[in-house]
Design a protein with these regions (language model features):
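Intrinsically disordered, low-complexity regulatory segments enriched in Ser/Thr/Pro
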Residues: 70-122
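Surface-exposed intrinsically disordered loops and tails
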Residues: 2-42
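Intrinsic-disorder/low-complexity loop/linker signature
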Residues: 7-9, 17-19, 43, 58-59, ...
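Generic structural hydrophobic/aromatic packing signal, biased to beta-strands
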Residues: 52-54, 64, 89-93, 126, ...
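Amphipathic, interaction-prone secondary-structure segments
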Residues: 26-85
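Active-site or metal-binding loop neighborhoods of secreted/extracellular toxin and effector enzymes
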Residues: 115-137
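Acidic/proline-rich low-complexity IDRs
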Residues: 9-11, 20, 28, 61, ...
């Protein structure tokens, strides 16, 4: 169940460009509130694992996991709230189906696109998929 009051809920309908969405993702990965919500023990190597929940332009609720840390599929493999810039991140279990090319290129299990991990996916690709979802679903 998506909770619009928890720190993981993001109002993305105001985001208009891929560059703005990349900033939203980087800010989300370094969000202290979200980290405290999901990983109160900051020494945990998995502390930058979050569910990102959002509502689309037409009101559909969607979510996906966005992760980055020294133990996950991201570039660079670092864990730090202060680091803030990742070129590739780990995405998992989106509640909608990504575009065919993204699934074919990045999904670990192409037969189950909403039930798989997308390792080392460029943050710009994630931003494009989020923008498409916000505008069309």
């Amino acid at each position: 169940m998506i909770n619009e009051t928890h720190p993981g809920f993001l109002p993305l309908v105001h985001v208009k460009t891929k560059e703005e969405m990349v900033k939203v993702i980087h800010n989300w990965l370094s969000s202290e509130e979200a980290v405290q919500e999901y990983c109160p023990n900051m020494r945990n190597p998995f502390c930058l694992r979050h569910r990102m929940d959002f509502r689309t332009d037409v009101g559909t609720l969607l979510n996906l996991g966005i992760q980055a840390s020294s133990q996950l599929y991201c570039t660079p493999r670092k864990t730090s709230l202060e680091y803030g810039f990742y070129s590739d991140i780990q995405v998992d279990y989106p509640s909608w189906t990504f575009s065919h090319n993204v699934i074919k290129t990045y999904a670990e299990n192409t037969e189950l696109p909403c039930g798989t991990v997308y390792p080392y996916i460029p943050i710009e690709v994630v931003a494009e998929e989020l923008l498409k979802a916000v505008r069309t679903l």
